[in-house]
């Protein structure tokens, strides 16, 4: 464990502060940092994008946070996308967040697997007047 667990209320408050400062009709997308190769056989230690961690507490590669406070669909106001996990991934790469543990960590109620990102984004992006990208 890199650090002691952080109360998810901190991340809920951080997202609420951001939502207050966003322009009306705005959508914000925060992407995880990439896993960088060190050579042909290995990768460097993963370090999460600061903004994604600040707003969600998620410290996992291939994660995306979408904030859309003015969405007409309540469940699309905060969405977290994670890499789908299974027992084999846990053995070879280490334990990853499930949808339940992601909610416990971040306080984001709507969690999808990252392979659904384009489908979900396509359904909500037309409502947005402004888009923020990290």
Locations of regions flagged by a protein language model:
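A composition/biophysics-driven feature that prefers long, compositionally simple stretches
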Residues: 1-134
């Amino acid at each position: 464990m890199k650090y002691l667990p952080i109360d998810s209320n901190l991340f809920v408050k951080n997202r609420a502060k951001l939502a207050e400062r966003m322009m009306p009709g705005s959508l914000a997308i925060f992407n995880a940092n990439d896993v960088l190769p060190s050579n042909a056989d290995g990768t460097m230690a993963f370090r999460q994008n600061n903004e994604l961690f600040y707003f969600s507490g998620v410290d996992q590669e291939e994660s995306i946070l979408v904030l859309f406070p003015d969405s007409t669909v309540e469940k699309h106001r905060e969405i977290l996308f994670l890499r789908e996990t299974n027992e084999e991934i846990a053995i070879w790469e280490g334990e990853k967040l499930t949808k339940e543990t992601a909610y416990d960590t971040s306080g984001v109620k709507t969690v999808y697997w990252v392979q659904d990102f384009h489908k979900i984004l396509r359904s909500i992006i037309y409502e947005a007047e402004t888009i923020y990208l990290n």
